[in-house]
Design a protein with these regions (language model features):
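N-terminal Rossmann-fold NAD(P) dinucleotide-binding loop
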Residues: 21-22
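Conserved hydrophobic helix-helix packing surfaces used for dimerization/oligomerization
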Residues: 12-14, 35
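Glycine-rich FAD pyrophosphate-binding loop
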Residues: 29-49
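Conserved N-terminal helical subregion
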Residues: 2-12, 29, 54-190
Length: 200
């Protein structure tokens, strides 16, 4: 890839406007890196359910200057309990005891996190209803063809387009998904059911 003197890619394409794509777009813009984003959806809409931001995620978001915006509308977690299918407790963590050293963990709706990230990347050019149909690595650049027929040359192409990534398939060929053995159920419940901010 061809890089400018400061070592940062000169022109970056981010494919996918989810959590990772928007976080990266905002971060690159703040560093003065020219980037643009394409998103398959025709328009932004609330997607997903509840999400937990652990202390590691909050540390990363704090480095991006976004922690305060998230904390104002989220539920701090005081404890977390893990149980098996028979309701037997496997583990319990008192998160409140860890906050002085590691910071807070938050529970919030995924769309609330997405909105904060979208606001942080508001100055990045975004092309909605657009996908990538071909990628060609030319050594010193990457040639990209888009679903609307447009073409572009980029120093770096980043696939942040999710589980069924078109970028991954174009770059590495089709690889079937492999079940990890884990299943996660997510839901949204009324705030009064959380036991005063508890996670268990």
């Amino acid at each position: 890839m061809t890089n400018p003197p400061n070592g940062c890619p000169g022109k970056v394409l981010i494919v996918g406007g989810g959590i990772a794509g928007l976080a990266l777009a905002g971060a690159l813009h703040r560093q003065g890196v020219a980037c643009q984003l394409v998103e398959r959806a025709e328009a932004w809409a609330p997607v997903g359910a509840g999400i937990i931001l652990g202390v590691n995620a909050m540390a990363a978001l704090r480095n991006l200057g976004l922690a305060e915006a998230l904390e104002s509308g989220a539920q701090p977690l005081e404890k977390m309990t893990i149980k098996d299918a028979d309701n037997r407790r496997l583990a319990r963590t008192n998160l409140a005891d860890l906050q002085p050293r590691f910071g807070v963990s938050l529970a919030l709706h995924r769309s609330d996190l997405h909105d904060v990230l979208l606001q942080s990347a508001r100055h990045v050019p975004m092309h909605m209803g657009t996908t990538v149909t071909s990628i060609e690595d030319r050594g010193d650049s990457v040639a990209v063809t888009f679903s609307d027929g447009d073409k572009g040359l980029f120093d770096l192409v980043i696939g942040a387009d999710g589980l069924h990534s078109q970028v991954r398939e174009l770059a590495f060929g089709h690889r079937p998904l492999r079940y990890s053995g884990y299943t996660c159920w997510r839901m949204v419940v009324g705030g009064g059911l959380g036991g005063g901010g508890s996670g268990g």
